């Protein structure tokens, strides 16, 4: 069993339906993303990191508690971390793939997201 990632909500547009942006990932993918978030945020943005990881003991990683500014800063820092790697090892390449395939598409749909 892995972790459940709660990114946030789609913008409200009067359509009935689920606005939640969530995905469940296996343990390998969850651990890779957890390590990526640690690397990108723990040292310079501890408060944001703590909000994201608050529910980790329940196997949940959540961006829902972040303000619009915190959300966009976290995304920027994670993207910077990924793109600043000169030579990625296999694990880092896997982290990037999981971010780009599983998390980033949800992030881009979140009502707080700004490019």
Regions found by a protein language model. Name each.
Residues 1-115:
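Acidic (Asp/Glu-rich) sequence patches and key acidic residues
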């Amino acid at each position: 069993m892995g972790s459940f990632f709660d990114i946030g909500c789609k913008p409200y547009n009067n359509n009935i339906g689920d606005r939640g942006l969530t995905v469940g990932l296996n343990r390998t993918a969850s651990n890779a993303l957890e390590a990526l978030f640690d690397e990108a945020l723990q040292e310079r943005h501890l408060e944001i990191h703590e909000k994201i990881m608050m529910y980790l003991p329940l196997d949940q990683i959540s961006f829902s508690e972040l303000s619009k500014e915190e959300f966009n800063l976290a995304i920027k820092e994670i993207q910077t971390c990924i793109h600043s790697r000169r030579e990625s090892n296999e694990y880092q390449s896997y982290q990037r793939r999981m971010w780009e395939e599983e998390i980033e598409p949800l992030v881009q749909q979140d009502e707080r997201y700004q490019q």
